[in-house]
Amino acid sequence: MGPEALSSLLLLLLVASGDADMKGHFDPAKCRYALGMQDRTIPDSDISASSSWSDSTAARHSRLESSDGDGAWCPAGSVFPKEEEYLQVDLQRLHLVALVGTQGRHAGGLGKEFSRSYRLRYSRDGRRWMGWKDRWGQEVISGNEDPEGVVLKDLGPPMVARLVRFYPRADRVMSVCLRVELYGCLWRDGLLSYTAPVGQTMYLSEAVYLNDSTYDGHTVGGLQYGGLGQLADGVVGLDDFRKSQELRVWPGYDYVGWSNHSFSSGYVEMEFEFDRLRAFQAMQVHCNNMHTLGARLPGGVECRFRRGPAMAWEGEPMRHNLGGNLGDPRARAVSVPLGGRVARFLQCRFLFAGPWLLFSEISFISDVVNNSSPALGGTFPPAPWWPPGPPPTNFSSLELEPRGQQPVAKAEGSPTAILIGCLVAIILLLLLIIALMLWRLHWRRLLSKAERRVLEEELTVHLSVPGDTILINNRPGPREPPPYQEPRPRGNPPHSAPCVPNGSALLLSNPAYRLLLATYARPPRGPGPPTPAWAKPTNTQAYSGDYMEPEKPGAPLLPPPPQNSVPHYAEADIVTLQGVTGGNTYAVPALPPGAVGDGPPRVDFPRSRLRFKEKLGEGQFGEVHLCEVDSPQDLVSLDFPLNVRKGHPLLVAVKILRPDATKNARNDFLKEVKIMSRLKDPNIIRLLGVCVQDDPLCMITDYMENGDLNQFLSAHQLEDKAAEGAPGDGQAAQGPTISYPMLLHVAAQIASGMRYLATLNFVHRDLATRNCLVGENFTIKIADFGMSRNLYAGDYYRVQGRAVLPIRWMAWECILMGKFTTASDVWAFGVTLWEVLMLCRAQPFGQLTDEQVIENAGEFFRDQGRQVYLSRPPACPQGLYELMLRCWSRESEQRPPFSQLHRFLAEDALNTV
């Protein structure tokens, strides 16, 4: 029997057994061999770095368990705060890297440098670099705790790479050194990337997210291209697609799926790019067939082939109709014979045979054509061509090269280790709860005996971060001391303020101010006095990007100070969760029962009319989706005018609460529904309806066709360039233009919407151009989900990695005192107006670091004339800039109300030109 006959027989056997297992599928658990740093298989010439402290700490000394030179690679520059120093390893060929090991500089006891955490970046072609992230989107990897020990970290998901860079991190200016090893195996299947439509969400009793969450390519217009993801990670899905082999992931994680209703063509088209010409024998696709929930095997597959990116598809496509036991609900691998066709690009169409197609892995059985020139060799190929059509897929069989070694054992994640870790965590949590209860009881006993003394002068400081919160309340004449108030030190008279030298010292002694600066290693400017005994940490209002409604009269938290003319706003309920569908911390206002229930009754929206377009943002317990509603005029429930032309869909934003949300999160979500139902203004997004009869809970609000104002303005040029240096000077008029009067019209609409919120005593707390939507004819509506979008993560300051605050838009009293009022919204409006006149070309205080912005808030508190203001935009007349400066007045009473701002922008602003 000749070789060709043997090959044909093998292919027939493979196709016949295709429904059982993935025969060509690799097991990532066995792909854990050391790749050559420690045993010097990787030569010194393939190890490089951004810099090194000296030749004795050069990159070649970064081998794990090696003591060459001074014992490790040490960068010349600081890794704090920019994190730009890196160590690079060139593997020369594509590898699947499943594990990394790190070590510090021990040098026989003379060294003490190591890196407590690091990031990874990798490349397959030397030009495009991707940052590695775990399955939950975290980039930072915990490193070493001492200079000698080796720490192994599993990479879940693994990465397919030729070049890998280690970026050490530090939380302060310090020396770091690193030794490393990579573990994995050669990536022999040759798949460089696959292109596919973005996976969708299936709504059953719970939401099943069938997206390719680890895809490392590009996503544009509902298409993923130029990367690899879950279809090539080696994880084969279970029979029940709602379950997963991975721990702590969402339902549907193992599968990427598409709904038949979203594809009028009746098929899903994918494209695969390989490193060189190959003769393809078969393709294996692991599919789900849980037909009781709508998942079906493909009805057939059609594949086309070509040898280069600019060439035409060759010959007739290979067609294969799938048979077998379609009634068996078990997941299976489907083998598609490819007849030995030679190509570097494949385009395959998978025909729908039911409501859903669900794939977990795609792999190919192929042989390299000997006369082909590799696309990845010692030198890098020309820039890859990314096809405009549907996605290529990556599924590979790996040939393991053990080099006489045994695979490295798993560093973490075994069931026994996880169980022990959980038990230890539970025990520690119980001990912590008991300790807190005893501590609280102890202080309550002390406070019950404390003198009820008060100050004549009020000082209130709130830092709006759950768990990192300061509350200092000193009110004249309270009937009883505030909760958890420490006894006043002896020697202070009961009705005299503590001896404070000046405002600067008072600020430096302010625990809230010190806490905001705690993440920086800069010493204080002066020795402030000891922290007063009455400065006691406690929890207060949590910050969110949503609206805050003041407490109704009748149950004030504390008596308002007599000298304060600004209406007193109640503290919000403490909600220790990172937002429901958006902001990292979310506060639901403390309202009497039924206080928000006086709006119109909520309207049940037909869930079936929503057609998903893209995900706008997400929070800990929910997401914000952009959807379309076809023929909205047919929905009688939408009883207010909708400016949608007949035959055109209506764009809506859908806030979705995940089924696994806590009870508190569900209550907060329903309370937000009630609050949103009260908002009826042409410049505020409106609640169109809700889906609360079953999970997932949804609220539907209107959305604007031109997206958010920040992106909209940044794509425009200023039409009138008479003002010297106006945004757009020196640039070719390539994009659309906008006039100065139209900018004023935009700002006037924002002021109008905020004027309406002020009449309800609502406080937005995150007013910015990213939270304004643009519709037809420059119609503006104020929204509230900008904080949930990763696009604007750089606009928010993280306090100890948890809460996020838009400090560049916040009034000084918000940053230092957590005091959010309509007057603080006026401050944010001034910054928003500055953004509008700058055409969103620059971030406010872009020349200042976050620390310096906080210090500038302190200068407003001290009021010694050293505070910094935003500069006048080039296109802004002096009269309008003076209005901005009034918005940034130190005293909140001196800031203009929104009614005055609206009147000026709508009627008088053009006269200031």
Curated annotation (Swiss-Prot):
Changing S496A: In a lung squamous cell carcinoma sample; somatic mutation. Changing G707A: Confers over 20-fold resistance to the ability of an inhibitor to inhibit autophosphorylation. The chain crosses the membrane at residues 418-438. Residues 192-367 are annotated as: DS-like domain. Residues 439-913 are cytoplasmic. It holds the Pfam family DDR1-2_DS-like. The modification Phosphoserine is found at S631. The Gly/Pro-rich domains may be required for an unusual geometry of interaction with ligand or substrates. Belongs to the protein kinase superfamily. Tyr protein kinase family. Insulin receptor subfamily. This is Epithelial discoidin domain-containing receptor 1.
